[in-house]
Amino acid sequence: MEKLTIGVLSLQGNFQSHINHFLQLQNPSLKVIEVRNKTNLRECDGIVIPGGESTTLRKCMSYDNDSLYNALKNYIHVKKKPVWGTCAGCILLSEKVEKNKDDNIENEYGNDFSLGGLDIEITRNYYGSQNDSFICSLDIKSQDPIFKKNIRAPCIRAPFIKKISSDKVVTIATFSHESFGKNIIGAVEQDNCMGTIFHPELMPYTCFHDYFLEKVKKHIKDSREA
């Protein structure tokens, strides 16, 4: 049985929970590895950028003259391999990150803070501090039977997808919040990229990890047939 490899960026954040969720799928063809450098990245058929703190993750990518940052950009935009970002990872996949009043990312990185891949505009820490974290009930828009109904998802210092800038972006799930309104975008995908503002790796279900695995399988199959 041919193996496929999914990597989880393991620089900062709760990467171990993502690894555990993929292992729960009990797929004998799946190998899951920690990714800490561009050598690890070369092994991967798909990669997850976990939650954590987006500016810290970006700084970790800056080591060795931005070598991992540049390798990830090439992975996303040139090789077009599947990438999934959760929370901070979703921020880093956004084409435009709205500047917060306390941010210094524009001065430090210019236009090179995010990796891009999702044509969305996103605001960091939109819902407040750690104390303002909440669990939402997702309204699944995807017709894929992998997704269960009545899914709840934790939003921890979550970003807000302010704008979708391309009709190539597909909404996977939305949710409502008593203070912020209805139909808030929670999960999106565009071509090889997928983003969730919440943390499915902290919940018992594995449907988002299963969905990403299927995305990786499809990419491998399509690449061979091209």
Swiss-Prot record:
GO BP annotations listed: pyridoxal phosphate biosynthetic process; pyridoxine metabolic process
PROSITE patterns tied to this protein: PDXT_SNO_1, PDXT_SNO_2
One cellular-component annotation, GO: cytosol
GO molecular function: glutaminase activity; pyridoxal 5'-phosphate synthase (glutamine hydrolysing) activity
Keywords of this entry: Glutamine amidotransferase, Hydrolase, Lyase, Pyridoxal phosphate
Enzyme Commission code(s) on record: 4.3.3.6, 3.5.1.2
Pathway: Cofactor biosynthesis; pyridoxal 5'-phosphate biosynthesis
Catalytic function, reaction form: aldehydo-D-ribose 5-phosphate + D-glyceraldehyde 3-phosphate + L-glutamine = pyridoxal 5'-phosphate + L-glutamate + phosphate + 3 H2O + H(+); L-glutamine + H2O = L-glutamate + NH4(+)
Active site: C87, H199, E201
Keyword Signal: no
Gene3D superfamilies: 3.40.50.880
Chain sites annotated for binding L-glutamine: G52, E53, S54, R124, I156, R157
Family: Belongs to the glutaminase PdxT/SNO family.
Record note on quaternary structure: In the presence of PdxS, forms a dodecamer of heterodimers. Only shows activity in the heterodimer.
Record's function text: Catalyzes the hydrolysis of glutamine to glutamate and ammonia as part of the biosynthesis of pyridoxal 5'-phosphate. The resulting ammonia molecule is channeled to the active site of PdxS.
NCBIfam families (alphabetical): PLP_synth_Pdx2 (TIGR03800)
Name of the protein in its database record: Pyridoxal 5'-phosphate synthase subunit Pdx2
Organism name: Plasmodium berghei
Lineage: Eukaryota, Sar, Alveolata, Apicomplexa, Aconoidasida
Gene designation per UniProt: pdx2
